[in-house]
């Protein structure tokens, strides 16, 4: 055998990054697929072009004069397992953006830009493009530019077909408009904005109920016969930015917001009110969506557990002054929101209780 033959054989047997499970060409193919989605998120301050080592944003071009930057990051949780098993990937990106930008909104901030982290064991460009299309849609719904992200192909880290997502959002608020306000007081009105569904919390419990009842994702949804179970549960998280931000800027009486995520009312409302006040909530006023009634019944879940795990139909809380409540309610309804008067702020009697429930959930 000649020396050249030895070299050729050695070359054929040699390892490559692709043979180790990381295909750079696949990554490049995905980038080409997602560029149109990303360009569609262009806004003042960002050109929504990718490819640099860092994403750029011109804060001055966004029109702020004395801004405070606000940052948030989050994920989608085990709702992703349903998307993976159903093969429906184009809405979980909306969830990812929603979980971040709704948190920015609570501080009074306008979402400016978003970055994502997508990790998988083996990159499928079609799957990846579907995911990023959802992220771009969430960015459009919230007015944020998608200025960058990371796609990580990590063989051996994830089971076949599995992936995980994380999102990072940055917004800005004029210093004088930061929330919560320092003038929250007894008698302030608590309003609730309807959720679009389960949103992105509690899915480990939902999946356990599905398993215990031997249900299949393509079964008709018991709470929504027009959809199969998997698609119905994947209804994306509602993004409240475009309906709520103009109202927050117009009415000084908007004093605080709370994004109802993991922990429900109990964990989230006390985070935005002073320790001297208590949020008194009348549960009987909530029009509980049928999906939550179904979950409670199938899982034999008590009301207290439902309230600390799920949003139970209310995705965002707004606390407003008494004299502003009617005008804010009408403005929100005009912007397409369903508003529920939930209660009032009262003087806290027990220092360990920032929330007091009245009535019962109609599950």
Curated annotation (Swiss-Prot):
One Gene Ontology term from the biological process aspect of the record: 'de novo' IMP biosynthetic process
Subcellular location: Cytoplasm
Domain of life: Bacteria
Predominant location category: cytoplasm
InterPro entries linked: PurM-like_C_dom (IPR010918), PurM-like_C_sf (IPR036676), PurM-like_N (IPR016188), PurM-like_N_sf (IPR036921), PurM_cligase (IPR004733)
E.C. numbers: 6.3.3.1
Keywords for the protein's UniProt record, in alphabetical order: ATP-binding, Cytoplasm, Ligase, Nucleotide-binding, Purine biosynthesis
Gene Ontology, cellular component aspect: cytosol
A GO molecular-function annotation: ATP binding
Pathway membership, UniProt: Purine metabolism; IMP biosynthesis via de novo pathway; 5-amino-1-(5-phospho-D-ribosyl)imidazole from N(2)-formyl-N(1)-(5-phospho-D-ribosyl)glycinamide: step 2/2
SUPFAM superfamilies assigned: PurM C-terminal domain-like (SSF56042), PurM N-terminal domain-like (SSF55326)
PANTHER family, per database record: TRIFUNCTIONAL PURINE BIOSYNTHETIC PROTEIN ADENOSINE-3, TRIFUNCTIONAL PURINE BIOSYNTHETIC PROTEIN ADENOSINE-3-RELATED
The protein's name in its UniProt record: Phosphoribosylformylglycinamidine cyclo-ligase
